[in-house]
């Protein structure tokens, strides 16, 4: 009796997380494999290729505040608006420069924030 792949997928879809965990453990025991080792072995070559691709096209950027310049109050206002920080936290961030203002933002957002901070008198860098 052959079991269709769709039937297997439907049965798995109806399982709880605990049942899935037990199923994986039983499959590892029956076939003498480890699901974690397979994931690491597959991910390792991709990481090497991904590093080269990441160097070519970076998608997440960090806006670094190098110095507040002469208009520190204006820079604090921009930092507060961009990050949602409170006055004290924004002031501490500006006083502690060089520091990251925002991390993991798109190129457009990073450039817009850099422009706002520079207009306020800050020295800014996008990494």
Swiss-Prot record:
- The residue ranges crossing the membrane are none
Q: Identify a single GO molecular function assigned to this protein.
A: mRNA binding
GO CC terms: cytosolic large ribosomal subunit
Cite the CDD domains for this sequence: Ribosomal_L7_L12
Gene Ontology process terms (BP): translation
* Entries under InterPro entries matching the protein: Ribosomal_bL12 (IPR000206), Ribosomal_bL12_C (IPR013823), Ribosomal_bL12_C/ClpS-like (IPR014719), Ribosomal_bL12_oligo (IPR008932), Ribosomal_bL12_oligo_N_sf (IPR036235)
For this UniProt record, give its keywords in alphabetical order, as a comma-separated list.
Ribonucleoprotein, Ribosomal protein
Question: What domain of life does the UniProt record list for this protein's source?
Answer: Bacteria
One Pfam family, short name: Ribosomal_L12_N
- Chain's role: Forms part of the ribosomal stalk which helps the ribosome interact with GTP-bound translation factors. Is thus essential for accurate translation.
State whether it acts alone or in a complex, and with which partners, per the record.
Homodimer. Part of the ribosomal stalk of the 50S ribosomal subunit. Forms a multimeric L10(L12)X complex, where L10 forms an elongated spine to which 2 to 4 L12 dimers bind in a sequential fashion. Binds GTP-bound translation factors.
By sequence similarity, the record places it as follows: Belongs to the bacterial ribosomal protein bL12 family.
Listed name of the protein: Large ribosomal subunit protein bL12
Species whose genome carries this gene: Thiobacillus denitrificans (strain ATCC 25259 / T1)
What phylogenetic lineage does the species belong to?
Bacteria, Pseudomonadati, Pseudomonadota, Betaproteobacteria, Nitrosomonadales
Primary gene name: rplL
């Amino acid at each position: 009796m052959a079991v269709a792949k769709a039937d297997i997928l439907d049965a798995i879809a109806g399982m709880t997380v605990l049942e899935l965990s037990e199923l994986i453990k039983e499959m590892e025991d029956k076939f003498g494999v480890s699901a974690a080792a397979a994931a690491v072995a597959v991910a390792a070559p991709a990481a090497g290729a991904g590093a080269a691709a990441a160097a070519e096209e970076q998608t997440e950027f960090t806006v670094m505040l190098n110095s507040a310049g002469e208009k520190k109050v204006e820079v604090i206002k921009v930092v507060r608006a961009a990050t949602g920080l409170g006055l004290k936290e924004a002031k501490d961030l500006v006083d502690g420069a060089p520091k990251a203002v925002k991390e993991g933002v798109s190129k457009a957002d990073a450039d817009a924030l850099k422009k706002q901070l520079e207009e306020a008198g800050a020295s800014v860098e996008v990494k």
